[in-house]
Amino acid sequence: MNSQNMSIISLVLQASWVVQLVMLLLVTVSVASWAAIFRKLFALKRVKALNEEFEREFWSGTSLNDLYASAAQNAKQAGPMERIFASGMREYQKLRERRITDPGTLLDGARRAMRASFQREMDVVESSLSFLASVGSVSPYVGLFGTVWGIMHAFTGFAGMEQVTLATVAPGIAEALVATAIGLFAAIPAVIAYNNFARDIDRVATHQETFIEEFSNILQRNLGTQPGGPTASGH
């Protein structure tokens, strides 16, 4: 390669096929990680908005019966917190239909149903995080592999030369280092996004766990004071 022609494109085109394959893999992974980042960004924004909307409705004084009916009617558009609430109410009503009247049994059943629903919701919210973590941790090493291979390939080409100068070494080393640069380009955004998403998801989880405890307290109060239970009263 001409030492004066060391643009990124020329370095990629002049690299060995193994290094080019590594670069292609890293670029593909980078594109996939950016797609995952934007999907997760919009998904988390929607989750937060739906949870806030339901929580406002929940604390507005609307009866639990009406909230449950609304959640059942709009199940596909409901947010995680609303589905958690609906699962607790559904289990409570099933136990009541079986003529179970013990407050402890009713409360425990509703709480277990909400915890199970909470875990399902968190599995959905946390999806693709492992992919971003893998991209962030593995990409630099894949890029390093491409660099090492490229340097070995460059040194092999120097073996037949009588005199090796910086001008002859630089292009081969530069094209090998491009693989490391692409690996870092793929890894850094993935790591930053992973850390931000993990923090936001922890907040969502804490918020939903707090709601479960608050709703459980409401059920407990109503079970202790209302003959008809929470379906017969507000909160």
Where are these regions (language model features)?
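Hydrophobic membrane-targeting segments
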Residues: 1-56
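Internal alpha-helical transmembrane segments of multi-pass membrane proteins, especially GPCRs
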Residues: 13, 17, 23, 127-130, ...
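Alpha-helical transmembrane segments
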Residues: 27-47, 144, 151, 186-201
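Predominantly long cytosolic amphipathic alpha-helical stalk/bundle segments
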Residues: 49-142, 149-165, 192-235
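Hydrophobic alpha-helical transmembrane segments and adjacent short intramembrane/lumenal linkers
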Residues: 162-176
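Hydrophobic alpha-helical transmembrane segments of polytopic membrane proteins
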Residues: 176-190
